[in-house]
Amino acid sequence: MGSRGQGFMLGCCLLLAVTWGPVLSLVPRVQEEQQEWEETEELTSPLDHVTRPEETHKRYSPSLREGLPTSRCYRCCDSNPPVYQTIPPPQINITILKGEKGDRGDRGLQGKYGKIGSTGPRGHIGPKGQKGSMGAPGDHCKSQYAAFSVGRKKALHSNDYFQPVVFDTEFVNLYNHFNMFTGKFYCYVPGIYFFSLNVHTWNQKETYLHIMKNEEEVVILYAQVSDRSIMQSQSLMLELREQDEVWVRLFKGERENAIFSDEFDTYITFSGYLVKPASEP
């Protein structure tokens, strides 16, 4: 090797010494600071894990950041922060807790009336009350009786119009409810009455009469033409109101119509009486 080769080797050695000298001098310092940082980390409580790694690195190795060359980057970081399991806050079941009884509140407003309920069962009979005082005298009661029975001793023949049968003999006429001049019974005591009519037919003539209530034909008494005369009767019950009229009517002369009687015997009778007054229950 010549002098040129030796000079080249010497230049290379000087270049290496200049370049790596500062770096090699920092290695012991980095190792000391790293050991010191590990000892400090062991003494740190678990809550320090939440500290940012950059702050920890700056705190424990400030000289390293200042001494390293600006052309290279060195970073020391902690491991990932621990994951803590989220525990839900405790809940209290207030339905099982019972507090002290409060004060009575104010009375509220009256509500609306409800619907009418069904009728309840009949109650027990109460005790008998005391006897009351005597009342004032009442009105005089009306007569609760009515009866009549009348007869006719003259024969009657039909003509061109209807004829009321008028009677000339009075057997019973209680309180004069039967009018002998008109031949009609007038009701003064409302109620139920019984009436009967008896006549004697005429030979070879028809017998045709009606028992009338006011102007209404109620029942008929009828006998056909016959060679022999006979007694014929009709009866019924009527419910009358006050001022109703009951009478006997002979049919008009479209056909030969007659009833027989004479002055020696009474062949025609008309009777009636009150069975039950309307005022009685």
Curated annotation (Swiss-Prot):
GO CC terms of this entry: collagen trimer; extracellular space; plasma membrane
Domain C1q: 141-281
UniProt keywords, alphabetically: Collagen, Glycoprotein, Secreted, Signal
Signal peptide as annotated in the record: 1-25
Biased composition (Basic and acidic residues): 49-58
UniProt-recorded name of the protein: Complement C1q tumor necrosis factor-related protein 1
Entry GO MF terms: collagen binding; identical protein binding
Residue ranges, annotated region (Disordered): 36-64, 107-136
GO biological process: negative regulation of platelet activation; negative regulation of platelet aggregation; positive regulation of aldosterone secretion; positive regulation of cytosolic calcium ion concentration; positive regulation of gene expression; positive regulation of MAPK cascade; positive regulation of phosphatidylinositol 3-kinase/protein kinase B signal transduction; regulation of glucose metabolic process
Species this chain originates from: Rattus norvegicus
Annotated Pfam families: C1q, Collagen
Residues with attached carbohydrate: N93
Stretches assigned to the Collagen-like domain: 99-140
PROSITE patterns: C1Q
Compartments where located: Secreted
InterPro entries associated with the record: C1q_dom, Cerebellin_Synaptic_Org, Collagen, Tumour_necrosis_fac-like_dom
Species classification: Eukaryota, Metazoa, Chordata, Craniata, Vertebrata
